[in-house]
Amino acid sequence: IGLIFQKSSTRTRVSFETGMFQLGGQALFLSSRDLQIGRGEPVQDTARVLSRYLDGIMIRTYEQKEVEDLAKYGSIPIINGLTDFCHPCQVLADLMTIREKYGVLKGLKMCYIGDGNNMAISLIVGGLKSDMQVSIATPDNYRPAKEVLDFAAGNDAFTLVNDPIKAVENADVVITDTWTSMGQEEEKKIRQQAFQGYQINDELMA
């Protein structure tokens, strides 16, 4: 499997390389500096070439379209290791951890507080598909993407509120994420103000 990292990560790289080794496979690390795609080669050409050498690709990148284009033009499985839109592998790991703790997922209430970012989006989709109750608390200006809210609309198991304390009522699992993701460093001060109170602390968990 080829591991393409447009965005660096300690845990994503180590977990995929370790997992492939433990399963008897091999992982080939590829940064943007190692690929012609980083120097203007069309993604369709990269997808076709890598499909001749690899059995699969995991890509951690910025734009969701890059993942979709690799899948469109390549002939091997493409794994989304992270994009600005979603973070499915992380949420699969989170759901596995929750199931290890409780033995089930169905019927549990999972709460997320903070930015309506890629983590929030994947938790909404993953949680609802697993028949969990999903409660999200985020400021109005940082809500999850409209297409995801449309996906969740009409599902009684989903709630979206502004108040973190209300969101965590009777929750079995409480999750949060960084207020400032990679590439948003210039917004750090604004985000610190916007997300005051959107953190897991003693007051919230009391």
Model-derived segments and their meaning:
Residues 178-198:
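Glycine/threonine-rich flexible loop motifs
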Residues 196-206:
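Rossmann-fold NAD(P)-binding glycine/threonine-rich loop
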Residues 67, 120, 183-184:
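Glycine/Thr-rich phosphate-binding loops of Rossmann-like dinucleotide-binding domains
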Residues 1-99:
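Phosphate/diphosphate ligand-binding glycine-rich loop within oxidoreductases
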Residues 28-32, 79-81, 107, 136-138, ...:
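Short beta-strands and strand-loop turn motifs
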Residues 95, 154-161, 194-198:
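Short gly/ser/thr-rich secondary-structure transition/capping motifs
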Residues 51, 71, 167-169, 205:
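A short, aliphatic-rich alpha-helical micro-motif
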Residues 6-19, 100-177:
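Glycine-rich phosphate/diphosphate-binding loop of Rossmann-like nucleotide-binding domains
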